[in-house]
Design a protein with these regions (language model features):
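Active-site-proximal polar cores
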Residues: 1-20
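Short, conserved turn/kink motifs that form compact alpha/beta structural patches or helix kinks used as
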Residues: 19-99
């Protein structure tokens, strides 16, 4: 693993007057950056995604988060892939509005 990323989980609490207050919980993980294939880029683009990066990390690091921070940029995680014979998971990232 040659880089660091932060998986971001949103947490919500209700305050005294019933308003939902959101907060973020960041968790540091080690990742490796991989190139997106042309096929992945094309298929994601067909579905309205703006694919940017694919990262790999140990599968135990990922708990269903949908936002990640990598190299001071926020991305949405639009797809994951976990090979049955590997302890790594692939995280496919896209730039989305609001991240």
């Amino acid at each position: 693993m040659d880089g660091v990323a932060y998986l971001i989980k949103m947490k919500y609490k209700t305050d005294k007057i019933g308003q939902n207050i959101s907060s973020e919980e960041k968790r540091k993980i080690y990742v490796s950056e991989r190139a997106l294939t042309r096929t992945e880029y094309f298929k994601a683009g067909q579905n309205g995604m703006n694919p940017r990066i694919m990262l790999t990390t140990a599968a135990v690091n990922y708990s269903g988060e949908s936002v990640i921070e990598y190299e001071n940029m926020r991305y949405g995680i639009y797809r994951t892939y976990h090979k049955f014979d590997s302890d790594e998971i692939e995280l496919y990232l896209h730039k989305q509005a609001g991240t």
